[in-house]
């Protein structure tokens, strides 16, 4: 039974909220962001019928984590995106508390969405349904309904289906929490997307030597890359280390061998996917030219998100830039999408003076052991020395300084700046640090320890969703 439509309220929220968001000095000029309300996980990232599609978790009615819809953008070139009709709203009993994250597939020429229907009970507790929806001729979507109930042996925290085709079968990984409150990744297979068979647990507590690795693993994504398979996921509750896993919830990757017949993934150690302050729930897709692309939510659940100043203008959060993945000699590399170079203006050398903070790309070559720093408007500071990088940012709740770290020999930095975000690519993508920051309109980028001949920058043209 369908619930009452909230579409009129959503349209009113967009009409009233969009002008405020676009006038905000912190609103991005070339990243994806909501025109009103709260945005979080990227969903359904796919190339289909000559277009790229990126769906995302969106609450258009408030800047909080209620009423999760699937909003939708599309593009022909990965640079210029346009708004599409809302794909999914929580208007059925099986998804009444949110159309949670998932993926998209091409099912014999039909764009099909696989998502989690979230249901919370008045007396406490919850359940989850894995659901399907298919695209109509007019670009809207028709819900098929649940195809997989809550698996036996797990709490109501089972979600985020990532589905793909291999040979004659569909496969799905799900993030899960077992009844002992331990994080797991589950594997299922199907011949038709409707009837699913459990193939067991492939990662998490008690698997491949892992012990205390969190109480819930979210947003899994398993894919081949180079000579290995890569599993990306978000282990909630993993123990903090002195300089690693410092965010409220981190995102990690692990490489290994995946056996389809046995339903087994033999992987190595966990690695943090992004060492910055804001990065979560990444999702990948394979392009027709063979590239594995990634996009993440430049946010973190809880933490200080509800103190961000954009709340005053009715919007919160943005996506990362799109990234290309490679796996070389045991290392996962993330590089900025090559198409982003089309946004560059004229190349500039550096005179040694401060630069006005504005959307730009910086290319900085370093010598191992160089001591240097970049100060982003007195709000965010990047320091480099022989041990690696330290990113410092003042808390939004107090005057306390918070830090994030990347350790290793720094040879080069590519820094991508937008109105309220910085993404730092280290050594050609060997490491990444992604962070939000909220400078004054007159903020400047200042430098220390940098020689002009090692520095080049390009202003970046505005390229907003239409």
Swiss-Prot record:
Alphabetized, the UniProt keywords read: Carbohydrate metabolism, Cytoplasm, Glycosidase, Hydrolase, Plasmid
State the reactions this protein catalyses: Hydrolysis of terminal non-reducing beta-D-fructofuranoside residues in beta-D-fructofuranosides
Which is one Pfam family of this protein? Glyco_hydro_32N
Q: Give the subcellular location.
A: Cytoplasm
Entry EC number(s): 3.2.1.26
Active-site feature positions: 41
Q: What class of enzyme is it?
A: hydrolase
Q: Single Gene Ontology BP term? A: sucrose metabolic process
The answer, when asked if Cell membrane is one of the entry's keywords, is no
Indicate the principal place this protein occupies in or around the cell: cytoplasm
Pathway annotation: Glycan biosynthesis; sucrose metabolism
Q: Which family does it belong to?
A: Belongs to the glycosyl hydrolase 32 family.
Quote the function comment for this protein. Answer: Enables the bacterium to metabolize sucrose as a sole carbon source.
The protein, known as: Sucrose-6-phosphate hydrolase
């Amino acid at each position: 039974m369908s619930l009452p439509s909230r579409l009129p309220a959503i349209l009113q929220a967009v009409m009233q909220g969009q002008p405020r968001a676009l006038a905000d000095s912190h609103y991005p000029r070339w990243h994806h962001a909501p025109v009103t309300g709260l945005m979080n996980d990227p969903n359904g990232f796919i190339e289909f019928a000559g277009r790229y599609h990126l769906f995302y978790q969106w609450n258009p009615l408030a800047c909080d984590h209620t009423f999760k819809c699937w909003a939708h953008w599309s593009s022909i070139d990965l640079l210029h995106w346009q708004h599409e009709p809302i794909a999914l709203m929580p208007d059925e009993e099986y998804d009444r508390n949110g159309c949670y994250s998932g993926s998209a597939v091409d099912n014999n020429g039909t764009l099909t969405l696989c998502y989690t229907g979230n249901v919370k009970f008045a007396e406490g507790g919850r359940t989850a349904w894995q659901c399907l929806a298919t695209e109509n001729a007019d670009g809207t979507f028709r819900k098929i309904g649940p195809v997989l109930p809550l698996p036996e042996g797990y709490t109501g925290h089972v979600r985020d289906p990532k589905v793909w085709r291999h040979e004659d079968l569909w496969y799905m990984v799900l993030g899960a929490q077992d009844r002992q409150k331990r994080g797991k990744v589950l594997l299922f297979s199907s011949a038709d997307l409707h009837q699913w068979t459990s193939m067991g647990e492939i990662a998490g507590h008690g698997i491949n030597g892992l012990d205390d690795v969190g109480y819930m693993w979210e947003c899994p994504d398993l894919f081949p890359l180079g000579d290995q398979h890569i599993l990306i996921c978000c282990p909630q509750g993993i123990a903090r280390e002195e300089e690693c896993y410092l965010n409220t919830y981190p995102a990690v990757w692990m490489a290994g061998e995946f056996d389809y017949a046995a339903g087994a993934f033999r992987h190595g150690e966990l690695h943090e996917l992004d060492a910055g302050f804001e990065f979560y729930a990444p999702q990948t897709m394979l392009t027709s030219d063979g590239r594995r692309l990634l996009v993440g939510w430049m946010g973190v659940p809880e933490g200080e998100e509800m103190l961000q100043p954009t709340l005053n203008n009715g919007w919160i959060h943005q996506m990362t830039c799109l990234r290309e993945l490679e796996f070389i000699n045991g290392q996962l590399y993330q590089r900025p999408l090559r198409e982003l170079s089309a946004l560059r203006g004229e190349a500039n050398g550096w005179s040694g003076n401060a630069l006005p903070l504005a959307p730009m790309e910086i290319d900085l070559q370093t010598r191992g052991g160089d001591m240097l720093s970049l100060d982003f408007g007195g709000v965010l500071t990047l320091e480099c020395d022989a041990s690696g990088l330290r990113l410092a940012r003042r808390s939004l709740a107090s005057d306390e300084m918070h830090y994030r770290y990347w350790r290793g020999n720094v040879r080069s930095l590519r820094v991508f700046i937008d109105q309220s975000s910085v993404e730092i690519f280290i050594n050609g993508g060997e490491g990444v640090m992604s962070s939000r920051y909220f400078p004054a309109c007159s903020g400047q980028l200042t430098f220390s320890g940098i020689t002009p001949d090692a520095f080049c920058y390009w202003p970046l043209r505005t390229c907003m969703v239409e």
